[in-house]
């Protein structure tokens, strides 16, 4: 049992430390697409006839926006942030990417989509509460309907019946966005160990969302961590290449990630 705990701790560190560098590119961007858009992006990533090249073109527009100073956020702990970025970057390429690539080669795309849908369904409380806090009552109501339909007819959320057959769409919101709608400023930039780019406001939001995320209450903790690793590896398997594309498009990847993250979060707050 002790060896199992040590092994899980090592895997957790290797996997989650690598996710931070790509989280904004994979989930914070693609994760906010509609179900039909997401299917197209998945098809493209699987080599099918889907549309899109992985990263949203709007994301690269963030680099141009920064030239006018629109996305400037203070970075007073630059050396710490850059060190965390470097660590996450290395662990992505040497741990998470190989693991996700092997997983992708073994597990068929339909099964991986089912796993992704399952974890997305689990985040219903976060979406519902934050839609409610933002006064988006219609979207909050839709979240309830989607959760009930997908949990029952969709078999624990593995199938997105509500999105495909009832034309209902989730409206992904988190506490960081909610704080933004209340005009709470972003604060300074942070590159968090394991979680990647953030701001002081988003970090506080992440801490608040922790308490309404069902996965954090799974017992025993080994199962919780195991599910977290599965979720991370599975999500990454759909987005291999996104982070690489961003890095290759910029002479300064650290700044590019910072600017793109900030612009993306601002657009999410405004929508």
Indicate where each model-derived feature is located.
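Compositionally biased, low-complexity segments enriched in small residues
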Residues: 1-2, 15
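Bacterial N-terminal signal peptides that target proteins for export
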Residues: 2-10
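N-terminal targeting leaders of membrane proteins
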Residues: 25-134, 227-271
């Amino acid at each position: 049992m002790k060896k199992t705990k040590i092994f899980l701790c090592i895997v957790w560190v290797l996997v989650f430390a690598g996710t931070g560098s790509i989280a904004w590119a994979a989930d914070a961007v693609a994760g906010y697409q509609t179900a039909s858009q997401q299917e197209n992006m998945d098809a493209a990533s699987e080599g099918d006839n889907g549309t899109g090249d992985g990263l949203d073109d709007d994301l690269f527009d963030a680099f141009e926006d920064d030239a006018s100073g629109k996305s400037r956020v203070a970075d007073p702990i630059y050396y710490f942030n850059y060190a965390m970025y470097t660590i996450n970057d290395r662990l992505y390429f040497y741990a998470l990417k190989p693991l996700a690539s092997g997983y992708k080669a073994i597990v068929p795309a339909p099964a991986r989509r089912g796993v992704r849908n399952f974890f997305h369904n689990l985040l219903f409380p976060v979406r519902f509460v934050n839609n409610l806090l933002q006064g988006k009552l219609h979207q909050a109501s839709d979240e309830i309907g989607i959760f009930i339909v997908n949990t029952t007819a969709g078999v624990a959320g593995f199938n997105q019946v509500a999105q495909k057959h009832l034309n209902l769409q989730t409206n992904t919101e988190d506490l960081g966005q909610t704080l933004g709608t209340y005009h709470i400023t972003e604060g300074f930039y942070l590159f968090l160990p394991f979680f990647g780019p953030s701001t002081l406001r988003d970090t506080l939001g992440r801490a608040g969302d922790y308490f309404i995320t069902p996965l954090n209450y799974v017992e025993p903790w080994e199962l919780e961590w195991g599910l977290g690793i599965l979720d991370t590896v599975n999500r990454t398997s759909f987005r291999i290449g996104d982070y690489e594309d961003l890095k290759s498009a910029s002479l300064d990847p650290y700044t590019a990630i910072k600017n793109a993250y900030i612009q993306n979060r601002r657009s999410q707050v405004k929508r």
